[in-house]
Each structure stands twice: as structure tokens, then as C-alpha cells.
A protein has these predicted regions:
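Bacterial N-terminal signal peptides that target proteins for export
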Residues: 2-11
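C-terminal motif of bacterial Sec signal peptides marking the signal peptidase cleavage site
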Residues: 18-21
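Small-residue-enriched, tightly packed secondary-structure blocks
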Residues: 23-183
Length: 183
């Protein structure tokens, strides 16, 4: 019983140090913008149809590097941009937490597309938009085909999680919170 408590305290302490280290070094607007440009380039280079998908959206979030780490208790954080008509209009932070069997760290990129003006406005007017509470995000998994067709997507908000190798499968954004930040 006492050993479990020690492990929990250790896990929470390590997680706090990991995420604290991420937030100590505030990322500059230029650095976030550069990372977002690179993430969009990787996305459009590796997934056929993605450029058309971005063009048809009312706006989209780009998180070039979201760090997920955990040891029993997990957390994720990252900073990104909201783009409308391909231009950055605001900066955002994503955060989430989870409990369960997990150990390690992973960096990933995310693009979340608002396919309607109503979905985009709902997001922009919130003070901290939470997936599963304020709206849902349909994650797109293209499998081995590495192509997407925007004509078949009917969801108002769709997300893509990827790394330099392409889209990543079996992931979730449930419980993630997106908060506007000043840069």
C-alpha cells in the first residue's frame, strides 16, 4: 500500500518536471510560425488531397509539435496557430491529461480543420474549447492509401495526427483543451 503511494508521488513529480520544462522555455511567435509552416509542408507532401482539404476549410489549427509524456499519469502540451485563408490569425495551446498504463514520451504534429464557418466561430468564441465537451473532432485515418478525399468528409471538425512519416493511427484528442495565447 505504501509502495503504491510512493510510485504515484514519483510519477506525478516526474510528469510535473517534464511538462514544467516544456513551459519554462516559452516559444516565440516566429518559432511557432516556422514550425507550423514545416508541419503543413510535411502534411501536404505526404498525404494526397490534403492541400485541397486545407483550402476548403473555414480555418485550421496547426500544432507543429505536441509533446505527450507519461508514467502512469500522462499529459500533452503544445503550441500552434489558427490559420484562416492560409494566414495566421491567432496562437493557441493544447493541453490534455490521462490516467492509465503508459510510459514514455512522443512528439507529434496535429492539424485540425474547421469545415464550416459555424464550427470555426464556435471554437473562436470559446474561452477554452474542449474536445468531447464543446465539440467533437473526427480523426481521419487514411490507412495505407495515404490520400484523403474532402468530398467524403461530412464532419464539421476533422483532425489529423501525424509525424514526418505520415498520419498516425489509433490516437485520440478526447479531453484535449485548446486555449488562445498571446505571442
Amino acid at each position: 500500500m505504501k509502495t503504491k503511494h510512493v510510485y504515484r508521488v514519483l510519477a506525478v513529480s516526474l510528469l510535473g518536471m517534464l511538462l514544467g520544462a516544456c513551459s519554462v522555455f516559452e516559444t516565440s511567435a516566429d518559432s511557432i510560425e516556422l514550425g507550423a509552416n514545416e508541419a503543413v509542408q510535411i502534411f501536404t507532401d505526404t498525404i494526397d488531397g490534403s492541400e485541397i482539404f486545407l483550402d476548403q476549410s473555414a480555418g485550421y489549427l496547426v500544432f507543429p509539435r505536441a509533446l505527450r509524456a507519461g508514467l502512469g499519469i500522462g499529459a500533452e502540451t503544445g503550441e500552434g496557430v489558427l490559420r484562416i485563408d492560409g494566414k495566421t490569425v491567432d496562437f493557441y495551446r493544447v493541453t490534455s491529461g490521462s490516467l492509465g498504463l503508459q510510459a514514455g514520451a512522443q512528439a507529434r504534429s496535429m492539424i485540425i480543420c474547421f469545415m464550416s464557418e459555424a464550427a470555426l466561430e464556435s471554437f473562436r468564441n470559446s474561452s477554452g474549447w474542449r474536445v468531447g465537451v464543446d465539440g467533437s473532432v473526427a480523426l481521419i485515418d487514411v490507412g495505407g492509401g495515404k490520400s484523403i478525399d474532402s468530398q467524403n468528409v461530412r464532419d464539421p471538425v476533422v483532425g489529423f495526427i501525424f509525424n514526418s512519416s505520415g498520419l498516425m493511427a489509433n490516437l485520440t484528442l478526447e479531453g484535449s483543451r485548446f486555449t488562445k495565447i498571446v505571442r
